Design a protein with these regions (language model features):
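Conserved AMP-binding/adenylate-forming core of the ANL superfamily
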Residues: 2, 20-49, 54-63, 67, ...
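Conserved AMP-binding A3 loop
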Residues: 30-32, 160-187
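Conserved structural elements of the adenylate-forming
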Residues: 35-40, 175-200, 211, 263-268
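Structural core segment of the AMP-binding/adenylate-forming
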Residues: 47-48, 71, 75-142
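Conserved pre-ATP/AMP-binding loop-to-beta segment of ANL
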Residues: 145-164, 170-171, 198-207
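Conserved AMP-binding/adenylation subdomain of ANL enzymes
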Residues: 183-207, 215-254
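Gly/Ser/Thr-rich phosphate-binding loop
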Residues: 228, 254-257, 268-332, 345
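AMP-binding/adenylate-forming catalytic core of the ANL superfamily
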Residues: 378-467, 477, 486, 490-493
Length: 500
């Protein structure tokens, strides 16, 4: 991306202020409204002396006004500190108090939640809305209090966003992501999925559907990518099949993005193929995509499903498929997340001594972006001789059962192969005798029946004895993170509650 992110966003906002920008709940917000909110946020931060890379908390709901606030902080050169609105009041207030930001922005409804103004701790409080367009001070928080507040990021490489990880294996962590990281990731995605190179600054005719939470990397990145490319967005509060199908049917996009669990939900809902007549490609990331789900979706809807691999630490995508790769390699490389994107390098190293592994050998995945150094991930994988990356699990979720190492991913893959199983999750629980034991929870497909005993018997035929879960339960819905990954802390809580 040759143009700095903030300059690019400012240029897009000024192209045609009256043109539609974001559809939300069947109503369009124009670029002028986004620019007005963004400009007012920028002005108010500067007015109270927060002009040097301010850290600004955003209770980041999927809402056009919060997109405007997000743009305002970035235009001011600040750091967006993401705060998850899906927490209960106690958790939300603890999160707000913990980040100690000098400014906090939210929708009016979130400011009305119990004790949120108190948790802000004297920060400048701003509430934003679109009906009418507004950016107002919160009563009692109209000026900067004494703090103490966190210091601004003064890194040589300015920080754009402190992003929450998905919290799949433990409590979410905050990852600082620089403006440069977003610029590189947007450029890499544009080059990988488009044949026309870096897009010019202009408004486009298509509509991109964003159904992932803005508080998660997938939703935030897709929003910034599409705005920087001048593309309209249809924004969902959360993914629901009927609302998603309505948007696809009305806007006829060529490409859509669905996480693996959303692909399965569309299949389960028996959505007719006609709904996807305009769609050529479906990108899918954030979690492993079972090959059987990919094959079933492609067969039913006649689309190319393009798995991808990314991480919060890299501000989005690292590797992926595109349509050209799919046409040539899809049948031979099932299970792969594609090849590294432009400006990304991937290598596999030994978990024990860090030496680089040969093609086809499993190890820890390391990534290097343009101008950077090698960064170790917690993911296990391998790269074949043709440069395709395969993800095999994580290095930090192994269960040690009496000295035997058990991968939750192996249990989940086996359970997903049962015809009655829609999805599954596995984690480890403490055990006095063995140290840890694996347990599993299963969500059944619509109309299917299977008992825990039947599923355990199914696993005994497919796994080693020490891999078979000590306990298995069937649940109506698996606990999930905001990005719809199965949550291991949530699984542990299920079993702890059942035991109590």
């Amino acid at each position: 991306m040759s143009q700095p992110l903030a300059a690019r966003l400012r240029a897009v906002l000024a192209l045609d202020p009256a043109a539609p920008a974001i559809e939300y709940r069947d109503s369009w917000t124009d670029w002028q409204t986004l620019a007005t909110i963004a400009g007012e946020v920028e002005k108010r931060l500067t007015a109270v002396g927060l002009s040097q890379r301010p850290a600004v908390g955003l209770i980041l709901r999927n809402h056009p006004a919060m997109v405007g606030a997000l743009l305002g902080v970035l235009l001011a050169g600040g750091c967006v500190v993401t705060i998850n609105p899906s927490h209960g009041d106690t958790g939300l207030n603890a999160d707000i108090a913990g980040v100690r930001v000098p400014a906090l922005i939210a929708l009016p409804a979130d400011w009305r939640r119990l004790d949120v103004p108190l948790a802000a701790g004297g920060a400048l409080g701003l509430q934003v809305d679109i009906n009418p367009t507004a950016c107002r001070s919160v009563s009692g928080l109209d000026r900067l209090g004494p703090g103490p507040f966190r210091a601004a990021h003064l890194d040589p490489d300015p920080i754009a966003v402190e992003m929450l990880t998905s919290g799949t294996t433990g409590p979410p962590k905050r990852i600082p992501l620089s403006y440069r990281s977003f610029e590189h990731t947007i450029a890499a995605a544009s080059a990988h999925y488009s044949s026309s190179g870096e897009p010019q600054v202009r408004l486009r005719s298509g509509v991109a559907i964003v159904s992932s939470p803005l508080v998660h990397m997938s939703g935030l990145f897709r929003t910034l990518l599409n705005i920087s490319e001048g593309r309209k967005i249809a924004l969902l509060e959360r993914f629901r099949v009927p609302e998603f199908v309505d948007l696809v049917t009305r806007h006829r996009p060529r490409a859509v993005s669905l996480v693996p669990s959303a692909l399965a939900m569309v299949l389960d809902a028996d959505v007719p193929p006609e709904a996807f007549l305009s769609v050529e490609v479906v990108t899918s990331g954030t979690a492993p995509l079972p090959a059987e789900v990919q094959i079933a979706f492609e067969k039913r809807y006649g689309v190319a499903v393009l798995p991808s691999y990314g991480a919060t630490e890299f501000a989005g995508g690292v590797a992926g498929w595109n349509l050209a790769l799919h046409r040539e390699w899809a049948e031979r490389k099932r299970g792969s997340v594609g090849r590294p994107q432009k400006g990304r390098e991937v290598r596999i190293v030994s978990v024990t001594d860090g030496t680089e592994m040969a093609a086809g050998q499993q190890g820890r995945i390391e990534v290097r972006t343009t101008g950077g150094h090698w960064v170790a991930t917690t993911d296990l994988g391998r790269i074949d001789r043709d440069g395709f990356l395969f993800i095999d699990g994580r290095t930090d979720d192994a269960i040690i059962r009496g000295g035997f190492k058990v991968s939750p991913n192996d249990i989940v893959k086996a359970l997903r192969s049962h015809p009655a199983v829609r999805d599954a999750g596995s984690t480890g629980l403490p055990d006095e005798r063995l140290g840890q034991v694996p347990v599993a929870a299963v969500e059944l497909a619509s109309g299917a029946t299977a008992t825990p005993d039947q599923l355990l018997e199914f696993l005994r035929d497919r796994l080693s004895r020490y891999q078979v879960p000590a306990r298995l339960i069937v649940v109506d819905e698996l606990p999930r993170t905001p990005s719809l990954k199965v949550s291991q802390p949530g699984l542990r809580k299920l079993f702890e509650e059942a035991q109590a």
